[in-house]
Amino acid sequence: SEMCIRDRSPINSPKTIADNKYSEIQDDKFQLQPGDIIVTKGPVMWGFFGHCSIAIDDKTILQIEGPGDKPTTQSFESFKYNYASGKNDWMKVYRCSYPGAGKKAAEWVKKNYENTNHRYLVTLNLNSKKFTYCTKIIYQAYKFGVSEKSVKSYGLHIISPYAIKDNFIDPYKLRLVKAY
């Protein structure tokens, strides 16, 4: 078998750890798909660990970051730099295994959250859109954009970023497609 040897020569210009790590992750040939769910370490807010966003096409993610914020879109490349290039950062990309589900979820998010004034607030109501948070957008995208059968059903509930994958039901289960 052939072995690939990477050039480990010293870098001439002084760079930060983030720049070095980012140069490794930026041209990784990974192809994002609409509906992909990106989970990161993120800041710890309100006792929540982690952060997540959803791909609305093959280059763009939509997220809502924190108190007072509205949903924003960002290129996947810059999102990777922000959330996956730090020394202790990590990022996982999950994909719904059900054919066509990701595209439907992405369309729903574009229609219901892109360029809206919905605000960040963690509430127990998983059905409302006026106040939302990172995982709630993803949960709704699959529940309302794909199928009520794709995710677990709750009364009043909060879903944390690290628990998002556990809320999907067969045959809609998420699979890990990329880790940074």
How should these model regions be labeled?
Residues 30-96, 119-129:
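Glycine-rich catalytic cores of cysteine/serine-nucleophile enzymes that process amide/ester linkages
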Residues 32-36, 50, 102-106, 110, ...:
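Extracytoplasmic/secreted envelope proteins and their assembly/folding machinery
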Residues 1-5:
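Short, small-residue-biased leader/transition segments that mark boundaries at the very start
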Residues 57, 66, 110-114, 139-147:
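Sec-exported extracytoplasmic/periplasmic mature domains
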Residues 7-8, 93:
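Low-complexity basic/metal-binding stretches
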Residues 12-30:
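Mixed-charge, Lys/Arg-rich low-complexity intrinsically disordered regions
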Residues 84, 98-117:
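A structural motif
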Residues 9-16, 124-180:
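Activation targets extended, charge/polar-rich intrinsically disordered C-terminal tails
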